[in-house]
Regions:
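Cyclophilin-like peptidyl-prolyl cis-trans isomerases
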Residues: 2-154
Length: 154
């Protein structure tokens, strides 16, 4: 992942870009293998809302700056729901929850408290921190919404 200054976004509080917010660019490479398909490479650009989730943003940016996410797989990809990554043990080709149940259950070792803000909602492309049933259990795992997922709000 690369942290870079840039502008992004569209229009709802989260669909507007706010000057000074950190922008994270995730470079994705997919090499077709036994799953088939075509090789793909591209960037996912995320704006982080520092005013609405300062602890979460500081944690995420810190992990990016430490290269924590480099080489980590998206271990959960569910069409019309989310794509999820951030488990440091999910780095070997072919290691996914189906073949290694521990893949997808680990994190950075540090947890952060849940931050709620009325402006934060699970719109298409929204970034969220994965957590267990304990609201204060987020660590390094994150997801990106594939379509609106308002059932995940709060």
């Amino acid at each position: 992942m690369l942290l870079t200054p840039a502008a992004t976004a569209d229009a709802s509080p989260m669909e507007q870009s706010f000057e000074g917010n950190p922008i994270v660019v995730i470079n994705i490479t997919y090499e077709a293998g036994i799953g088939g398909g075509s090789d793909i490479e591209g960037d996912i650009v995320l704006e982080l809302f520092l005013n609405w989730a300062p602890i979460t943003v500081t944690n995420f940016v810190g992990l990016v700056n430490e290269s924590f996410y480099d080489g980590i797989f998206f271990h959960r990809v569910i069409d019309d729901f989310v794509i999820q990554a951030g488990d440091p043990t999910c780095t070997a080709v072919g290691v996914y929850p189906a073949s290694d149940p521990s893949c997808g259950s680990n994190g950075s070792g540090e947890t952060i408290p849940f931050e709620a803000d009325a402006n934060l909602t699970h719109i298409n492309g929204a970034l969220g921190m994965a957590r267990s049933v304990d609201p204060d259990s987020a660590s390094s795992q994150f997801y990106i919404c594939d379509g609106p997922q308002h059932g995940l709000d709060n």
